[in-house]
Amino acid sequence: MVNSIENRKVNCLVLLSGGLDCAAALWYAKRKGWNPLCLHLYNPNIIKQAEPELAHAQLQADFFNVELVVDDKSSLPQETKENMYSVLQGMSAIAMIIQGNKDINFQYIIWGANADDSFRQRLQLRYPLRALAAGQSHQLEVHGVKPRHIVQAPLNVFPFEYLYKSEIISMITQDKPELLDIVWSCSGEYKVEKGFEYIPCGKCTKCLEFNYAKHTAKKSLFKKQEGRWV
């Protein structure tokens, strides 16, 4: 995985799960004119939606014509069913990519966290980033980190941490509405049709959350604004 990057001109990383928020993060990177590399965590041992998530992540990468690297050998344990630290898992794989490709200047890591979960992601990222900085300087703790390694370290970007899911959908609808057709948001018993097309259950909390957010966005996007601009 580390040495399988074909495009050596990439300058940022996007963790692409196949869901809405990560797809929006990829949209943001492309809209900014950056050259993203996408990373997908493939965990069939603990995630029953691993196949549709990977399939939709690939669809999203193809949609934006970017490279997708799949990590199926994460350095973190995969057996536990109570893995509440997916961000740490992603950061571990990201660190492997950065450390294993010193010729690539990764400037940004773009996260799709929204207003509901950005705080949790920031907390989980704090210490892995400290460890990464210390490791690049071959130090046991951060006081000895070289200034150049702080300057060279990629910045974590949270472009949607002040937006709710329906607001992200509204934004995407105005620019790339077809992107919403290749988003996977289901944690229930999905169906498979025609060998590839994955059909969400429509009943689980993830399905209900996504459908409600789309409904809210649709009702709000074109409503008449009251008052007038001065």
Positions of PLM-derived features:
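Nucleotide-activated chemistry modules centered on ATP-dependent adenylation/adenylyltransferase
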Residues: 2-230
